[in-house]
């Protein structure tokens, strides 16, 4: 029964994640003029789409790989590769999203990294990069000792949840900041809740719902991967023969 609830949660997460990306893309296409790669505001429009796709949806999916019951038995190698690959894909989307916003700022002569949103965002990306490279070095390569892996595993899990929480916070602050900027001198101000504001606010709520459900699945003790024992724990990926 627990497995059934888990897969139901996965279906809900898949739907919510897809809606987060599609809603963000529709907002940029319908209200903000679409997409381009020319340094203009149309290039900026890639930024929210790629950050939601990478730092929230793909990151959340990667975090849940070891919650799949099918990953609890048999060789661990495919699941480790999938976990790392999804995180790498998320990081790639994030880097392209950052390139889009920095090039737009350069083209429009806008200062970089001055808002709280940008500080939160860049902090999250730096933590994500450190988390990925540390995980690769410690849990993938064979040099690390069992003691070091045992020490860092809880920190790896903790910072994974922290990074997802920071990603959600960054997205919400970014949506709010964007609406304040674009509706500041509009015919209908933000305070009058025009259609764009309602849609973007709803997109933000979808992101929050997705993130909270991911965190719930991660924290649910009945859905955690069973401890395979000390012997398996000290085997690095490159020596996995299960």
UniProtKB/Swiss-Prot annotation:
InterPro entries: CYB561/CYBRD1-like, Cyt_b561/ferric_Rdtase_TM. Changing residue 131 to A: Decreased transmembrane ascorbate ferrireductase activity. Approximately 55% reduction in enzyme activity. The chain crosses the membrane at residues 5-25, 41-61, 82-102, 120-140, 155-175, 203-223. Changing residue 119 to A: Decreased transmembrane ascorbate ferrireductase activity. Approximately 80% reduction in enzyme activity. The gene is Cyb561a3. It comes from Mus musculus (Mouse). This is Lysosomal membrane ascorbate-dependent ferrireductase CYB561A3. The lineage of its organism: Eukaryota, Metazoa, Chordata, Craniata, Vertebrata. It catalyses: Fe(3+)(out) + L-ascorbate(in) = monodehydro-L-ascorbate radical(in) + Fe(2+)(out) + H(+). Changing residue 156 to A: Loss of transmembrane ascorbate ferrireductase activity. Present in lung, spleen, thymus and testis. Present at low level in brain, heart, liver and kidney. Expressed in the alveolar macrophages of the lung, in the white pulp of the spleen, widespread in the thymus, and in the Sertoli cells of the testis (at protein level). Changing residue 83 to A: Loss of transmembrane ascorbate ferrireductase activity. Heme b 2 binds at residues 67, 83, 156, 224. It is an enzyme of class 7 (translocase). Homodimer. Changing residue 117 to A: Loss of transmembrane ascorbate ferrireductase activity. It is found in: Late endosome membrane; Lysosome membrane. GO terms for cellular component: late endosome membrane; lysosomal membrane; lysosome; nucleolus. Residues 26-40, 103-119, 176-202 are lumenal.
């Amino acid at each position: 029964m627990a497995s059934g609830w888990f897969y139901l949660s996965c279906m809900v997460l898949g739907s919510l994640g897809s809606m987060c990306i599609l809603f963000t893309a529709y907002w940029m296409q319908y209200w903000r003029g679409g997409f381009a790669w020319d340094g203009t505001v149309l290039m900026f429009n890639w930024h929210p789409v790629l950050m939601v796709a990478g730092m929230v949806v793909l990151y959340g999916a990667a975090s849940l790989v070891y919650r799949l019951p099918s990953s609890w038995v048999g060789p661990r190698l495919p699941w480790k590769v999938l976990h790392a690959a999804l995180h790498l894909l998320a990081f790639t989307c994030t880097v392209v999203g950052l390139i889009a916003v920095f090039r737009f700022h350069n083209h429009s002569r806008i200062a970089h990294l001055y808002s709280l949103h940008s500080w939160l965002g860049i902090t999250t990306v730096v933590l994500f990069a450190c988390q990925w490279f540390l995980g690769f070095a410690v849990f993938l390569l064979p040099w690390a000792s069992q003691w070091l892996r045992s020490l860092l595993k809880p920190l790896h899990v903790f910072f994974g949840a922290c990074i997802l929480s920071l990603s959600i916070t960054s997205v919400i602050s970014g949506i709010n900041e964007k609406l304040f900027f674009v509706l500041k001198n509009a015919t209908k101000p933000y305070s009058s809740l025009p259609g764009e504001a309602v849609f973007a606010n709803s997109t933000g709520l979808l992101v929050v719902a997705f993130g909270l459900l991911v965190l719930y699945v991660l924290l649910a003790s009945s859905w955690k991967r069973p401890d395979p024992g000390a012997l398996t724990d000290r085997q690095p990926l490159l020596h996995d023969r299960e």
